[in-house]
């Protein structure tokens, strides 16, 4: 395990599913309001890091194992976000995970759909333009400790190009279908790099300035960039040495 201390966060080259890394993070941050995770999906992406010989049940159980460990690092009412996909025929670990992860002290509060602009798929099926984000709350209530959800503005009527007659607008709460974030196509820093805005939203909603947010699968380091923009601190954990080295280099001043 390698720990790099930056001015506004911590990067760890290690296995986030290990007790050693968990203990190290807890010693540094104490309990936190938000943990984010974008794990490998398992045989879904045609990349070496996504290959697994596990069945979907075994893969779901692997996810459950580190979820149960890391939920202990959350404050009461803390939020736990996990990215996932519908999978492929015969291999749907994320769907099994959603059912198995919930218990009386860990509630599945919502499943968010990120509606993307680019579609993919095969000719004999509907095209996919979505990705799922499970949102859990620690405790026996679905009410999170912090929920600072911003209102979104929606313009109605004509385009409003005439300054004499500005377009009317109204504000509305964000739904569990996010259509206002454009994805990154073939991210340059990681094959499945998330758009920064889609990472910022949970940080805005569940944390306050100065809070720590923990990312269990650091990847491109997008969570750190989002945290910096919003005045939060971060802990990023990445197992792959090459991905880790690139991530830390990008995050250095």
For every predicted segment, state its role.
Residues 93, 252-253:
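Class I S-adenosyl-L-methionine-dependent methyltransferase module
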Residues 1-237, 242-244:
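Core catalytic lobe of class I
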Residues 247-248:
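Conserved SAM-binding loop
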């Amino acid at each position: 395990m390698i720990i790099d201390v930056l001015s506004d966060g911590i990067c760890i080259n290690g296995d986030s599913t290990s007790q050693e890394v968990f203990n190290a993070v807890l010693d540094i941050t104490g309990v936190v309001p938000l943990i984010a995770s974008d794990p490998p999906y398992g045989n879904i992406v045609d990349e070496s890091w996504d290959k697994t010989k596990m069945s979907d049940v075994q893969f779901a159980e692997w996810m459950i194992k580190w979820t149960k460990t890391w939920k202990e690092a959350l404050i009461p009412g803390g939020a736990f976000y996990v990215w996932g996909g519908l999978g492929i025929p015969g291999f749907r670990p994320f769907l099994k995970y959603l059912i198995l992860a919930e218990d009386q002290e860990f509630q599945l509060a919502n499943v968010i759909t990120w509606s993307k602009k680019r579609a993919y798929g095969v000719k004999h099926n509907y095209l996919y333009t979505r990705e799922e984000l499970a949102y859990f709350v620690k405790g026996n209530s679905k009410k999170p400790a912090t929920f600072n959800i911003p209102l979104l503005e929606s313009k109605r009527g004509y385009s409003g190009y005439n300054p004499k007659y500005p377009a009317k607008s109204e504000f509305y709460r964000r739904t569990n279908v996010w259509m206002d974030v454009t994805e990154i196509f073939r991210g340059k820093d990681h094959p499945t790099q998330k758009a920064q805005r889609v990472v910022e939203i949970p940080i805005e909603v569940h944390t306050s300035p100065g809070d720590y947010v923990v990312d269990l699968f650091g990847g491109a380091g997008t969570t750190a960039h989002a945290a910096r923009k919003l005045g939060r601190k971060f802990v990023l954990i990445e197992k792959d040495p090459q991905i880790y080295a690139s991530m830390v280099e990008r995050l250095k001043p």
